[in-house]
């Protein structure tokens, strides 16, 4: 599943490509891709004619403001979305493609959106778990996209710090990796970046969360945000399905310290990286560097 860096990469691509984008036509190729009340019929009706404003990311969710007229943003904000919100979750294999010329859709195309110039934004999803929502104007996105209600703080926010983690993890016996994967504790982290950040922080993924000291939690917070920052700069990670809006792979995978490097020598100490299942997730770690 695309994690925070991959979703942020997509957000930036959409923000760049969809400047002054007015939706002229929408085609839903698979009904289950639309998760909001009213299904595809209402989704199509309410998006057609709308101007797409700012793209936001919350955890692994994407949201675009919709406007009846072109949104004239100030330095600090843009007008309220009088057309509501357009929400997206890529899930396992969802990806956006940009097509300037007319082309036939592949079998896994789920939603097609054209502007007035007949340029197409295409949503392709092999596993068909990706979802879209239309949120009516005047409603907070989380009232319709209910998964937003459960999200913890963003890793880059001031709310995510060692004091916060210490309170949330106090007395917990579950492995720290499992805690980091919990979206109600920190939004956006997934299997790749939990492995990478725990390695950077020199913490074993099996360590009971509640046993970590304040200094270790502070180091973990710093390492997680730094790993995410580096991956965003590399355009995310591609091991299978992820591509950005232009079809380009993410480049972080080649820089990974432990993820998908089971059996290979640790880049720091040359100890073979271990791969095992922890809490049902493939987990990579160095038994020498992480104690």
UniProtKB/Swiss-Prot annotation:
Residue numbers binding DNA: 108, 127
Active-site feature positions: 2-3, 60, 281
InterPro entries tied to this protein: DNA_glyclase/AP_lyase_DNA-bd, DNA_glyclase_Znf_dom_DNA_BS, Formamido-pyr_DNA_Glyclase, FPG_cat, MutM-like_N-ter, Ribosomal_uS13-like_H2TH, Znf_DNA_glyclase/AP_lyase, Znf_FPG/IleRS
Swiss-Prot/TrEMBL cofactor(s): Zn(2+)
Co-factor binding details: Binds 1 zinc ion per subunit.
Gene3D superfamilies, per database record: 1.10.8.50, MutM-like, N-terminal
EC code: 3.2.2.23, 4.2.99.18
PROSITE patterns: FPG_CAT, ZF_FPG_1, ZF_FPG_2
Signal peptide stretch: none
Protein's GO biological process: base-excision repair
Catalytic function, reaction form: Hydrolysis of DNA containing ring-opened 7-methylguanine residues, releasing 2,6-diamino-4-hydroxy-5-(N-methyl)formamidopyrimidine; 2'-deoxyribonucleotide-(2'-deoxyribose 5'-phosphate)-2'-deoxyribonucleotide-DNA = a 3'-end 2'-deoxyribonucleotide-(2,3-dehydro-2,3-deoxyribose 5'-phosphate)-DNA + a 5'-end 5'-phospho-2'-deoxyribonucleoside-DNA + H(+)
Highest taxon in the source lineage: Bacteria
Alphabetic keyword roster: DNA damage, DNA repair, DNA-binding, Glycosidase, Hydrolase, Lyase, Metal-binding, Multifunctional enzyme, Zinc, Zinc-finger
GO molecular function annotations of the record: 8-oxo-7,8-dihydroguanine DNA N-glycosylase activity; class I DNA-(apurinic or apyrimidinic site) endonuclease activity; damaged DNA binding; zinc ion binding
SMART domains on file: Fapy_DNA_glyco, H2TH
Zinc finger map (FPG-type): 257-291
Keyword Hydrolase in record: yes
Pfam families: Fapy_DNA_glyco (PF01149), H2TH (PF06831), zf-FPG_IleRS (PF06827)
Homology family: Belongs to the FPG family.
Quaternary structure note: Monomer.
Biological role: Involved in base excision repair of DNA damaged by oxidation or by mutagenic agents. Acts as a DNA glycosylase that recognizes and removes damaged bases. Has a preference for oxidized purines, such as 7,8-dihydro-8-oxoguanine (8-oxoG). Has AP (apurinic/apyrimidinic) lyase activity and introduces nicks in the DNA strand. Cleaves the DNA backbone by beta-delta elimination to generate a single-strand break at the site of the removed base with both 3'- and 5'-phosphates.
Protein name, entry field: Formamidopyrimidine-DNA glycosylase
Source organism of the structure: Prochlorococcus marinus (strain MIT 9313)
């Amino acid at each position: 599943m695309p994690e925070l860096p991959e979703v942020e990469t997509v957000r930036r691509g959409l923000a760049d490509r969809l400047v002054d984008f007015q939706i002229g036509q929408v085609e839903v190729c698979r009904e289950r891709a639309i998760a909001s009340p009213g299904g595809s019929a209402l989704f199509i009706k309410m998006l057609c004619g709308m101007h797409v404003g700012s793209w936001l990311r919350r955890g692994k969710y994407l949201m675009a403001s919709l406007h009846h007229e072109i949104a004239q943003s100030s330095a600090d904000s843009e007008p309220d979305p009088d057309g509501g919100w357009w929400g997206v979750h890529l899930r396992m294999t969802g990806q956006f493609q940009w097509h300037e010329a007319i082309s036939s859709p592949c079998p896994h195309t789920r939603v097609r959106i054209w502007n007035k110039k007949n340029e197409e934004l295409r949503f392709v999803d092999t596993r068909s778990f990706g979802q879209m929502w239309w949120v009516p104007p005047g409603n907070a996105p989380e009232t319709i996209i209910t998964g937003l209600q459960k999200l913890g703080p963003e890793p880059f926010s001031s709310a995510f710090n060692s004091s916060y983690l210490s309170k949330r993890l106090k007395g917990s016996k579950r492995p720290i990796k499992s805690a980091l994967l919990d979206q109600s504790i920190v939004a956006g982290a997934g299997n790749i970046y939990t492995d990478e950040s725990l390695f950077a922080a020199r913490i074993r993924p099996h360590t009971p969360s509640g046993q970590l000291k304040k200094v270790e939690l502070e180091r973990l917070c710093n390492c997680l945000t730094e790993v995410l920052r580096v991956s965003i700069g590399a355009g995310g990670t591609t091991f299978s399905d992820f591509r950005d809006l232009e079809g380009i792979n993410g480049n972080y995978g080649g820089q990974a310290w432990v993820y998908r490097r089971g059996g290979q020598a640790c880049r720091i100490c040359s100890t073979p990286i271990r791969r095992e299942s922890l809490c049902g997730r493939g987990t990579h770690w160095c038994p020498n560097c992480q104690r």
